[in-house]
């Protein structure tokens, strides 16, 4: 099997169609055909027929996720942690590569459409729900089930299962499903930002699992918060434009944004909850704990100063007493 042929890697001068100087979609297509016999250019998302496109399969999968992690945590209560370091490294490395590849393919397609048709077309026009983008949306959706393994590693290592982590992982799979089903044209922005964050996040986990000291841990959460702010700007704009155009045309708007109202409201609600939860997590983890840590350090320094001062006072008193003794003896002799 030849995976290095010149016909696979087509080099171009950077342009609207090939912003990276390489035809990434062609490369992805050829690799997919040669490795797994699947042509992404022929993919068609059909609700109810495409794998994991039925409400029943999605609900069962997410329910199974919560059952597994809760029962798994209970099973591990009286057992020693299973670190699975190599497997954890591989998991994070794979997700870093997948996220980066999907992000590059997404940028290539969106950039082409943006340069030819403008920003509003990309955000709101139903024609921007292209076959290539739908394929990438679907592949991104499938990765959400792979990401559920994050929690499995947590309970195997007997790490605490925070509500934010479990809620976020389970609901994100449902969120991606509803947006595919609702054909929201704005979802490329949310997915692109999420993929960018995941490149940072999973590369951090990979490096940490390899024993590297990574200084930018806090920035993972900061970038996630920025991501949700930008997500909500896009989603609220799209939802408002759709409602104003369809139901309240007397309100100021710039045109219709395609997608179902259910998908729009569900997306706005979920992303809003993410923003509040991640801000709360950041405050509790880095600000409050940091303040307490500084207080403990200050208290430790104060204790050390007090001990040193007390020791100095005792030494001074002893020295004074020693120096005073001869004069006392002389006075008694006189």
Swiss-Prot record:
Residue numbers on the Lumenal membrane side: 1-51, 108-135, 182-187, 246-260
GO BP terms, alphabetized: fatty acid elongation, monounsaturated fatty acid; fatty acid elongation, polyunsaturated fatty acid; fatty acid elongation, saturated fatty acid; nuclear membrane organization; sphingolipid biosynthetic process; very long-chain fatty acid biosynthetic process
Membrane topology: Multi-pass membrane protein
Main location (coarse class): endoplasmic reticulum
Transmembrane segments: 52-72, 87-107, 136-156, 161-181, 188-208, 225-245, 261-281
Enzyme Commission (EC) number: 2.3.1.199
Keyword entries, A-Z: Endoplasmic reticulum, Fatty acid biosynthesis, Fatty acid metabolism, Lipid biosynthesis, Lipid metabolism, Membrane, Phosphoprotein, Transferase, Transmembrane, Transmembrane helix
Residue intervals annotated with topology Cytoplasmic: 73-86, 157-160, 209-224, 282-334
Catalytic activity: a very-long-chain acyl-CoA + malonyl-CoA + H(+) = a very-long-chain 3-oxoacyl-CoA + CO2 + CoA
GO cellular component term of the entry, any: nuclear membrane
InterPro entries reported in the protein's UniProt record: ELO_fam
Annotated positions of the Phosphoserine modification: 325
Any one GO molecular function term: fatty acid elongase activity
The keyword Membrane belongs to this UniProt entry's keyword annotation: yes
Family per similarity comment: Belongs to the ELO family.
PANTHER family: ELONGATION OF FATTY ACIDS PROTEIN 1-RELATED, FATTY ACID ACYL TRANSFERASE-RELATED
Function comment: May be involved in the synthesis of very long chain fatty acids.
Protein's UniProt name: Putative fatty acid elongase 1
Organism of provenance: Schizosaccharomyces pombe (strain 972 / ATCC 24843)
């Amino acid at each position: 099997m030849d995976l290095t042929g010149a016909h696979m890697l087509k080099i171009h001068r950077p342009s609207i169609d090939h912003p990276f100087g390489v035809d990434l979609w062609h490369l992805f297509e050829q690799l997919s055909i040669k490795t797994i016999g699947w042509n992404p250019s022929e993919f068609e998302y059909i609700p109810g027929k495409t794998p994991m496109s039925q409400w029943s399969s999605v609900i069962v999968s997410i329910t199974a996720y919560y059952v597994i992690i809760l029962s798994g945590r209970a099973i591990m209560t009286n057992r020693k942690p299973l670190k699975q370091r190599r497997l954890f490294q591989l998991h994070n490395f794979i997700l870093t590569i997948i996220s980066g590849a999907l992000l590059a393919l997404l940028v290539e397609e969106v950039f082409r459409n943006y340069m030819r048709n403008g920003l509003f077309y990309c955000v709101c026009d139903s024609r921007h729900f292209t076959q290539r983008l739908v394929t990438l949306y679907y592949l991104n959706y499938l990765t959400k089930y792979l990401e559920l393994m994050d929690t499995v590693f947590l309970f195997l290592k007997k790490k605490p299962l925070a509500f934010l982590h479990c809620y976020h992982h389970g609901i994100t799979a449902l969120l991606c499903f509803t947006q595919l089903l609702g054909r929201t044209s704005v979802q490329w922005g949310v997915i692109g930002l999420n993929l960018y964050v995941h490149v940072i996040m999973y590369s951090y986990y990979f490096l940490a699992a390899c024993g590297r000291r990574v200084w930018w841990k806090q920035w993972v959460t900061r970038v996630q918060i920025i991501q949700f702010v930008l997500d909500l700007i896009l989603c609220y704009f799209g939802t408002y434009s759709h409602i104003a155009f369809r139901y309240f045309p007397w309100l100021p708007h710039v045109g219709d944004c395609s997608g179902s109202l259910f998908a729009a409201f569900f997306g706005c609600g979920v992303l809003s909850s993410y923003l509040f939860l991640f801000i709360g997590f950041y405050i509790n983890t880095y600000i409050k704990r940091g303040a307490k840590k500084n207080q403990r350090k200050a208290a430790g320094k104060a204790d050390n100063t007090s001990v040193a001062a007390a020791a100095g006072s005792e030494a001074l008193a002893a020295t004074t007493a020693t120096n005073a003794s001869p004069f006392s003896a002389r006075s008694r002799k006189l």
